[in-house]
Amino acid sequence: MAGTALKRLMAEYKQLTLNPPEGIVAGPMNEENFFEWEALIMGPEDTCFEFGVFPAILSFPLDYPLSPPKMRFTCEMFHPNIYPDGRVCISILHAPGDDPMGYESSAERWSPVQSVEKILLSVVSMLAEPNDESGANVDASKMWRDDREQFYKIAKQIVQKSLGL
């Protein structure tokens, strides 16, 4: 199974290298281990995360693409769909099948036709448009709903930290 996963990851890396999506850089942490990737995601334009550069790690299971990877930001983040420890909570990273909570449709969840590029583009969209109904960070979700100005202020501080300012 790991051989299939490795071939798929190598093909996806080649595609990302030849045709990188705007504002995203991603690839294996080293050539010895294609199952751990690092990514840099630029904050989406015209959002409170604009100009930020946010590092993350993608950890792929040995049965990829049958199962989704896990993704975690390695910098400070304050966002409704990012746990305080950096783990990303987004439908595309949830295991295939029906949602036991009945919130997501199976079409929104992981399937083997998804790709690293689709994951990263989905995360960029998530940064731009948080889903406050599915709060991984309760404080950020509440602030996004009730005090948008304060949320933007914290996001701007995180952007500055991401740039070493």
From Swiss-Prot:
PROSITE patterns: UBC_1, UBC_2. It comes from the Eukaryota. The modification N-acetylalanine is found at A2. GO terms for biological process: cellular response to interferon-beta; ERAD pathway; negative regulation of retrograde protein transport, ER to cytosol; protein K48-linked ubiquitination; protein polyubiquitination; ubiquitin-dependent protein catabolic process. It catalyses: S-ubiquitinyl-[E1 ubiquitin-activating enzyme]-L-cysteine + [E2 ubiquitin-conjugating enzyme]-L-cysteine = [E1 ubiquitin-activating enzyme]-L-cysteine + S-ubiquitinyl-[E2 ubiquitin-conjugating enzyme]-L-cysteine. The active site is at C89 (glycyl thioester intermediate). GO terms for cellular component: cytosol; endoplasmic reticulum; lipid droplet. It holds the Pfam family UQ_con. Residues 4-164 form the UBC core domain. GO terms for molecular function: ATP binding; identical protein binding; ubiquitin conjugating enzyme activity; ubiquitin-protein transferase activity. Its EC number is 2.3.2.23. Its main location: endoplasmic reticulum. InterPro entries: Ub_conjugating_enzyme, UBQ-conjugat_E2_core, UBQ-conjugating_AS, UBQ-conjugating_enzyme/RWD. It is found in: Endoplasmic reticulum; Lipid droplet. Keywords: Acetylation, ATP-binding, Endoplasmic reticulum, Lipid droplet, Nucleotide-binding, Transferase, Ubl conjugation pathway. Pathway: Protein modification; protein ubiquitination. Belongs to the ubiquitin-conjugating enzyme family. Accepts ubiquitin from the E1 complex and catalyzes its covalent attachment to other proteins. In vitro catalyzes 'Lys-48'-linked polyubiquitination. Involved in endoplasmic reticulum-associated degradation (ERAD). Required for sterol-induced ubiquitination of 3-hydroxy-3-methylglutaryl coenzyme A reductase and its subsequent proteasomal degradation. Interacts with AUP1 (via C-terminus); the interaction recruits UBE2G2 to lipid droplets. Interacts with ubiquitin ligases AMFR/gp78 and RNF139/TRC8; recruitment to lipid droplets by AUP1 facilitates interaction of UBE2G2 with AMFR and RNF139, leading to sterol-induced ubiquitination of 3-hydroxy-3-methylglutaryl coenzyme A reductase and its subsequent proteasomal degradation. This is Ubiquitin-conjugating enzyme E2 G2. It comes from Homo sapiens. The lineage of its organism: Eukaryota, Metazoa, Chordata, Craniata, Vertebrata.
